[in-house]
Amino acid sequence: MIVLLQRVLEAQVVRRAEGEQAEEPLGAVGRGLLAFVCAEPGDSTAVIAKAARKTARLRIFEDENGRMNLSAADIGGGVLVVSQFTLAADCTSGSRPSFSNGASPAEAQKAYLAYVEAL
């Protein structure tokens, strides 16, 4: 499992239907983390649980002394999780990336839901 984390003051994911102006909010978070998650073939429940634990406990927020010493949980922050299969892209040869390092859609959905549940 590949997880890319971004500290955010706020973040949201919206969907806009083709030809429409209105956006439909799908998820949002205030101060906390935006987690882009990519499942890889064979991700075990242990790997997924470890990734979720690491996300929740990673001390990347400043404490009162300005040191990165607090986790998202410590600051009462949330985590907005976005499935992002492109993190598995292999661009080592040619001009077209290969996504063979990513899990199948069914396996990825299962891993994504397990990650969210473990958070």
Q: What does each model-identified segment do?
A:
Residues 1-94, 110-119:
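N-terminal, polar/charged subdomain of small-to-medium soluble alpha/beta proteins
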Residues 93-107:
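A charged helix-plus-loop insertion that forms the helical arch/lid used to bind
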